[in-house]
Amino acid sequence: MYKITSRYLQQESFRSSPHKGIDFKMEIGEPIRSIKSGQIHLADYGNTNAGKTVFVEWEDGRTAIYGHLNEFAVKEGQHVNAGDLIGYAGNTGFSTGSHLHFSVKEGSKHIDPSPYMNDIQHMNDPSYFAQVSSDVKVSFFDYFQQHMDLIGTQLTDLKVNFVHFLALSDYSPIIKLLQNVIQFIFFNI
């Protein structure tokens, strides 16, 4: 487990405004993995801000920010999946020690990244993302099964309505036509 050294909206003496993310103490070179699938954007702020930073634009429109990296392991525009290596922890930018700055934006506004703390804590555990992936597959199967049940019900209703239609209809002209067609085909050969 990574020690949390600064929390969301925490006001430290060296900050001019509340913290917009969560800082996790990490050694330089610790692998950093994306916690969700998305599109990569890179920034290098030099000795300011979050230094080398990876932005992962998630499929739900939110953006995860991984800052103070020592090195990138991805390229601009690349697509990553949950669990993919995106870089290595470092001490770049305005930093008081080696750590990962993690934050989340919705549009242009930072939101509380606390719901994703567990994902960061387990980002280097391959079985964690395999479990998350299998949960999604089960959910998709449940969704598919639910809709197949609905389609089956609608087909049953259609069948009942068709039988009801035939029972109420005078279909003797149809039978007479079929008899004539069969006689023509089989007896006029």
Task: Map each language-model feature to its residues.
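Short hydrophobic beta/alpha edge segments that flank linear recognition/processing sites
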Residues: F24, T53-V56, N81-S95, F102
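Gly/Ser-rich catalytic serine loop of serine hydrolases
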Residues: G29-E30, V74-E76, G90-G93
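Residue-level recognition of beta-strand microenvironments
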Residues: R7, S37, A43-D44, F72, ...
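Residue-level detector of conserved, well-ordered beta-strand and adjacent loop positions
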Residues: T5, K25, E57, G67-N70, ...
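Acidic, glycine-rich catalytic/binding loops that coordinate metals and/or anionic ligands
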Residues: K3, K25-E27, K75, S103-I189
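Surface-exposed, glycine-biased beta-strand/turn segments
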Residues: M1-G51, A82, D142, I175, ...
